[in-house]
């Protein structure tokens, strides 16, 4: 049974790869068609396009890394190839996490209602705020790349001094663990920011519901519905990102103790996040949902 597990996990990874490419490609295609036809695009749609493109890159990185790890081919990659592979993973993962976090901030500033002068100032300049945050995240990306480059340089120096097979395998596993740990630490910041946005949205919704009760109005007013929809999107991101984060953390520990089965399971769970969250974004967006249902109806009619 255990010998069949790599094949089973590989099939799941391939399925996630296909779903992820289809869902993210759909987001890019529909928004680009809308952009061309209307000659303009909202800020949230632009965010969705960039997020979807970054996730397509991440999904491809996951697939390539999976097969390299499965056949222990990573240690045969040259220094330049190793840098390209790891750096492209870091860049795609960085924008994948931060753009989803920025989307949460966008919903917070657009939907939430607070009397704080600072919040109102940010709310009036939401597009500039989003742009500044996006540019600010490049600092984290730059620091992450510097740290990883130091780890790569250190490993390559040791590899050139001792090229025996046993040393290469064990030292590469140590190097891989260090890279994963560094990436995990840099992933904590966007998760924390998204979680704070979620708490503020919940607090804003609670205040709004209390106000509705005082005014003897029902909870089905448009503002409540907008709050609820935004919360669903942010909650789905947080839950899936938490599973992604935990899978990276556990795979890091399992790789440290050389538990291959747990490592493969965590990698499979981690790949579920960039594939499934984009599908949930389609269902949570009125334009994308309508286009998806239209395409699904046409496909079903041809059967």
UniProtKB/Swiss-Prot annotation:
SUPFAM superfamilies: Family A G protein-coupled receptor-like. Keywords: G-protein coupled receptor, Glycoprotein, Membrane, Receptor, Sensory transduction, Taste, Transducer, Transmembrane, Transmembrane helix. It comes from the Eukaryota. One of its GO terms (biological process) is detection of chemical stimulus involved in sensory perception of bitter taste. It is found in: Membrane. The keyword ATP-binding does not apply. GO terms for cellular component: membrane; plasma membrane. Residues 29-55, 107-128, 206-232, 283-303 are cytoplasmic. InterPro entries: TAS2R. Glycans are attached at residues 162, 166. It is a multi-pass membrane protein. The chain crosses the membrane at residues 8-28, 56-76, 86-106, 129-149, 185-205, 233-253, 262-282. Most taste cells may be activated by a limited number of bitter compounds; individual taste cells can discriminate among bitter stimuli. Receptor that may play a role in the perception of bitterness and is gustducin-linked. May play a role in sensing the chemical composition of the gastrointestinal content. The activity of this receptor may stimulate alpha gustducin, mediate PLC-beta-2 activation and lead to the gating of TRPM5. Belongs to the G-protein coupled receptor T2R family. PANTHER family: TASTE RECEPTOR TYPE 2 (PTHR11394), TASTE RECEPTOR TYPE 2 MEMBER 13 (PTHR11394:SF28). This is Taste receptor type 2 member 13. The lineage of its organism: Eukaryota, Metazoa, Chordata, Craniata, Vertebrata. The gene is TAS2R13.
